[in-house]
Each structure stands twice: as structure tokens, then as C-alpha cells.
Amino acid sequence: MIRLENVSVDFPAGKDAQSRAVNNVNLTIQQGEVFGIVGTSGAGKSTLLRTINLLQRPTEGRVFLGDTLISDASGRELRQHRQRIGMIFQHFNLMHTRNVYDNVAFSLRAAGKSKEEIASRVPEILALVGLQDKEASYPAQLSGGQKQRVGIARAIANHPEVLLCDEPTSALDLETSASILALLKSINVRLGITIVLISHEMSVIKSICQRMAVMTGGNIVEEGEVFTIFSAPQHAYTKQLVSHTTPIELPERFKQNNKGVLLKILFADDSVEQPILSDVAQRFQVSVNILHGNIEYINDRALGHIIAQISYRDDPAAENLAAAITYIRQNTFGVEVIND
């Protein structure tokens, strides 16, 4: 378990001035989970991540790894704590004059492992990340995805309890990003390593994390299960991020020229599998026209967004229309009228 208590980080900002990058953060990350921190550039997420392994010392506050206070550690004690925490970076940070084998072996040598232990561990860990045939290759001969796999192998070579991931896919294309995220998820499941991942992309957080925090201006403004935050964001900034990830909007002309009521409907879990809109059409004698929609799965839970037009049939009856909307509201996760 990782626990941050009242952690703040200040940087010099001119003569006798300080700029606060992280402001009074309290955060608990459970053992074995994949936890995401999302925010735009300058939000403070990289600085916060680096306080966990003390690459960045907190100006204020305390950092715990398990029950151990590590933020006051230094020297040999700090090095011992850092061996419990691996880290991968946006731009890989490989040694270009050493081949793949030696890049991974470097972290083992630094930890004092014997030649025999290194000779046994390096092939094992390269096989885990799918690079068993690249031992003799140099970074210049590798693709971006392969370089990140070397970074992952190096980071987990010493059996860490925690893996910190600093924008691990931002330098990669979509297909390669997906393969790296799948690898991280597999490592989490197979090895039980706690993963803390930061990204400016909500889609990355959504694809791999169980819980998440939203960060802006050095502050965590929202925290919770990924599904809950995507289905019912509370903070205005979080709502903005979610809307960019799942854009469910119609051209303005549809709203202006539409003869019925336009509803933005949120389906979740079991309601996704129910014929709710079909039931509405039959029960209340209204016409239902689906204009836009999608369904996705977050941590094996269904989340759907639909924009539907509800209108009268041959015999207009306002009470039928109102009753239909009420029925939808009662049987889904949320309804918003968007053409009042």
C-alpha cells in the first residue's frame, strides 16, 4: 500500500518566490491495484508520481510504503526503499551503448546481484515482456514499443512491489500503446505488482486502471473507481475530460429543427441489456429514433450513451410523452433533455 499524507511540492520561481506544483495531496493506493492519475500538462501529476520513490522530495507531507515512512529516508536506507519501486518513463531512458541484455542487467548489478543470478534472471524477464530474441540488439535497432518493453523489463527485474509509469504510451502509436497497456495489465495480474500510472489521456486510464484520481493545478479534484468517474463525474474539470473521451453530441441543426424531444440517455450495467427504448415505444405509443450512441466496457462493466428522439405518433398526447421520459429515467442511469 502507498499512502501520501498532506504532500506538497514547491519549486523556486524567482527571487524569494515559490511555485506550488503539488498542493496538499492525500492519497491511498491499495496493494495490487492499477491506479491512474490523469490531468493535462502542468497539472502536477509527474511531480506527484516522483514523490512516491522520492526522485522528488516533498516540501511538506509524508510518504509511506506499506507501514514504513520513507519520505525521511536518505543514503543506504533510501536506496533500499527504492529497490522496492520500479519506474518506466515516457522516453524509455535506455543506455544506447549497451544491448538489451545489459540494459536489463544494469539494474540487477546495481542491486548487488551475482553473475549467476543475473544470467538466470535476464532471460526470464525478457521472455515475460516478449523480447526473448532481442538480447543482443541495441536500442537503435528497436521500435518504440520494444524500447518500452526493455524499460519495463529493467524496472521489474528486481521483483519490486510497485511499478511507477510516467506517461508510458505517450510516445507510441495507438496499436503499440494498446500492446504496452496489455503487457502492464498482464504483469499486474501475474506478479501482483501495484501499478501507479499517470497520463493525460483518459482513454489510457480507462483501459487499464481500477481506480483513478483527477488532477489539475496541483490538486486532486476527484478520486474513485474508474467506472464511477466515467459514468457520473462530479467535478466540472472531470466532466470536461470525460466529455472529450466520449463525445456524444449532435450538430446544432438537429437540435433546432427537431420536432420531438431529444434525450441524452446513460445506460449502465444491466440496463444496457434491457430493451428499454423498445418497451417505451410500445407502452406509451411514442416513436423512438436513435440518432447517436455507443457502448463500451470498463473493468467488465457496460456503459452506454445514446441520443434518442422521442416524438408523438398519430394521436398527440403530451401525457404519454412525459410518462415515456419518466419511464426511461426510472430504468436507466441518467437522462438529460438536450433541446429544451
Curated annotation (Swiss-Prot):
It comes from the Bacteria. Disulfide bonds: none annotated. Its main location: membrane. It is a peripheral membrane protein. ATP binds at residues 39-46. The complex is composed of two ATP-binding proteins (MetN), two transmembrane proteins (MetI) and a solute-binding protein (MetQ). This is Methionine import ATP-binding protein MetN 1. It comes from Pectobacterium atrosepticum (strain SCRI 1043 / ATCC BAA-672) (Erwinia carotovora subsp. atroseptica). The lineage of its organism: Bacteria, Pseudomonadati, Pseudomonadota, Gammaproteobacteria, Enterobacterales. The gene is metN1.
